[in-house]
Swiss-Prot record:
Function: This is one of the proteins that binds to the 5S RNA in the ribosome where it forms part of the central protuberance.
Keywords assigned: Ribonucleoprotein, Ribosomal protein, RNA-binding, rRNA-binding
Protein name stated in the entry: Large ribosomal subunit protein bL25
Pfam families: Ribosomal_L25p (PF01386), Ribosomal_TL5_C (PF14693)
Domain of life according to the entry: Bacteria
Oligomeric and partner information: Part of the 50S ribosomal subunit; part of the 5S rRNA/L5/L18/L25 subcomplex. Contacts the 5S rRNA. Binds to the 5S rRNA independently of L5 and L18.
NCBIfam families: bL25_bact_ctc (TIGR00731), PRK05618.1-2 (NF004128)
Protein's GO biological process: translation
Record GO cellular component, one term: cytosolic large ribosomal subunit
InterPro entries: Rbsml_bL25/Gln-tRNA_synth_N (IPR020056), Ribosomal_bL25/Gln-tRNA_synth (IPR011035), Ribosomal_bL25_b-dom (IPR020057), Ribosomal_bL25_C (IPR037121), Ribosomal_bL25_long (IPR001021), Ribosomal_L25_dom (IPR029751), Ribosomal_uL5_bac-type (IPR020930)
Gene3D superfamilies named in the record: Ribosomal protein L25, beta domain (2.170.120.20), Ribosomal Protein L25, Chain P (2.40.240.10)
Lineage: Bacteria, Pseudomonadati, Pseudomonadota, Alphaproteobacteria, Caulobacterales
Gene Ontology MF, one: 5S rRNA binding
Family: Belongs to the bacterial ribosomal protein bL25 family. CTC subfamily.
Length: 199
């Protein structure tokens, strides 16, 4: 079951005018789409939506949508923010079954920078992908993919095959793509050159 429950109401007016009217009422307008049903214009109370956002478990996660006695599992696909105030302006929700296989972008997190063999030698981490698209059941979406840099040395290439994924979760692409490289910096190359010359 999803951790977040959003209480929604149906919006009568669509389009820009309808969205503005919804925001004037202190609510955030959105659209529910996906599956065999037609898109539905919805709204959530502003304080409730902001509270859900601040948990960090709204966007890209399984959410329970509640309208009266009806409940629906959805994925929060996108949120638009005001460029100045950073207030949420609009959101998109996608209908899913809890066990439905979906494709979704998951953030990559690198840990143990301070004890990384390669970084301690002066190497640099070149990140190729900050997110990875995974295929997984809607109720098993990982929070993030964690890569441990502790044992990685200069010259190492970190590929998706090195990451232990949860059961039932796999990369959306079949090829063994690169996520990051540990490269020699100019300073580390210079140090190695000086050492070689002295020897």
């Amino acid at each position: 079951m999803a951790e977040i429950i959003l209480n929604v109401e149906i919006r009568d007016r669509a389009g820009t005018g309808g969205s503005r009217e919804t925001r004037r009422q202190g609510k955030v307008p959105g659209v529910l789409y996906g599956g065999p049903l037609a898109p539905v214009n919805i709204a959530v109370k502003g304080n409730e939506f902001r509270k859900a956002l601040h948990t960090g478990k709204l966007l890209g996660h399984l959410v329970t949508l509640q309208h009266g006695d009806e409940k629906q599992s959805v994925i929060a696909k996108a949120v638009q923010f005001h460029p100045v105030t950073d207030e949420p302006l609009h959101f998109d929700l996608y209908r899913v079954d809890e066990h439905q296989l979906i494709k979704i972008e998951i953030p990559v997190h690198f840990k143990n920078h301070d004890i990384s063999v390669g970084l301690k030698k002066g190497g640099t981490l070149e990140i190729i992908r900050h997110t990875v698209e995974l295929a997984c059941p809607a109720d098993k979406i990982p929070e993030e993919l964690v890569i441990d840099l502790a044992s990685h040395d200069i010259g190492d290439t970190i590929r998706i095959s090195e990451i232990k994924l949860p059961e039932g979760v796999r990369p959306a692409m079949e090829r063994d793509f690169v996520i990051a490289n540990l490269k020699a910096s100019a300073a580390s190359q210079s140090t190695e050159g000086d050492t070689t010359a002295e020897a």
